[in-house]
Amino acid sequence: EGTRPGDSAADVLARCDGVACEDTRVTGKLMKHLGLSKPLWRYDDHANERDRARLVESMHDRAIALVSDAGTPLVSDPGYRLVNDCRAAGVAVTTLPGACAVVAGLTLSGLPNDRFLFGGFLPSKEKARRDVLEELGSVDATLVFYETGPRLLKSLAAVSEVLGAREVAVARELTKLHEECRRGLPDGLTAYYDANPPKGEIVLLIGPADPGDVEHDIDALLTEAMTELKASQA
């Protein structure tokens, strides 16, 4: 079943034949709030190829809605595999606009948003985290990552060490009662959140490098290369 322009999520949930969701308990509460009763199928990080195949097969004669517990499905979410399989099987797919922490964080932060790069969650291991920041640090765009409260301080420390004094924003609990967005340099934010441990879901945004800083980095690399070349020729 196709959706009409302007359809809301509630419209689609009312008309669909069933719902694939991260947690049937969470989505069950939503359906109850809407006064709806539909079959619910769990689809999360643990879903395998067989689970997807069953869902795709059911979609040839039924309309199935895919929802997440929070935010937009498929953004840092396993739903993209299901959509990929649907397209491969010739199943029609459509989407609805909705809440997305990446976009909400960008608009709230005030950092440049004409160009941005979403990197999902930063790795939990220190070296891997540094490697990602070094790899993406030269991109002329605002970098956006998802983060958790317990790991935020380590990520801010890595940003300070790898990228230096770049403007950073920490947005958390977006669209909720305790929404907060703090902006500053990594060391200052580290001090604040060390004294005020953050809770909830977090979006970490890192502003692009100042053009002057990039030129300085290039000059430093050239100087280092020339020094190594002279040493090898000595």
Model-derived features: positions:
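Glycine-rich, flexible N-terminal cofactor/catalytic loop recognition
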Residues: 1-46
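Class I SAM-dependent methyltransferase SAM-binding "motif I" and its flanking Rossmann-like core
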Residues: 81-139
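Short active-site oxyanion
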Residues: 12-19, 90-94, 142-143
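Glycine/small-residue-rich loop that forms an oxyanion/phosphate-binding "nest" at active or ligand-binding sites
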Residues: 52-100, 104
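Alpha-helix capping/helix-boundary segments
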Residues: 25-27, 101, 151, 210
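A contiguous loop/helix-start segment that scaffolds small-molecule binding in enzyme catalytic cores
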Residues: 63, 142, 149-233
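Acidic, metal-coordinating catalytic cores used for nucleic-acid/nucleotide bond scission
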Residues: 47, 70-78, 124, 152
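Conserved helicase motor
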Residues: 41-50, 122-125
